[in-house]
């Protein structure tokens, strides 16, 4: 899990920036950015382990929401997918 170089070193900000970059590169198709999302959640998990559940980072979900997201991801595919509109 290497850090993207284009962002500041705020708590997990490089990983949040990597998600933004991935979404832009993939036409906002979240399902193509699973690895970037997982990397952010791993960073946020470490952030809370080091700073406690009451810590805050603008780049991380609140502690309880992060726990829910990690549980959901462990249960299977949960990324949003783009649905092609009919023309």
Swiss-Prot record:
Localization: Mitochondrion intermembrane space
Keyword Disulfide bond included in the entry's annotation: yes
Cellular component GO terms held in the UniProt record: mitochondrial intermembrane space
Domain of life: Eukaryota
Cx9C motif 2, short sequence motif: residues: 33-43
The entry's keywords: Disulfide bond, Mitochondrion, Repeat
Pfam families, sorted: CMC4
Domain CHCH as annotated: residue spans: 9-51
Ribonucleoprotein among keywords: no
Chain segments annotated as coiled-coil in the UniProt record: none
Residue interval(s) of motif Cx9C motif 1: 12-22
Cystine crosslinks: 12-43, 22-33
SUPFAM superfamilies per UniProt: Cysteine alpha-hairpin motif
Residues in the signal sequence: none
PANTHER family named in the record: CX9C MOTIF-CONTAINING PROTEIN 4
Similarity comment: family membership: Belongs to the CMC4 family.
Domain note: The twin Cx9C motifs are involved in the recognition by the mitochondrial disulfide relay system.
Name under which the protein is recorded: Cx9C motif-containing protein 4, mitochondrial
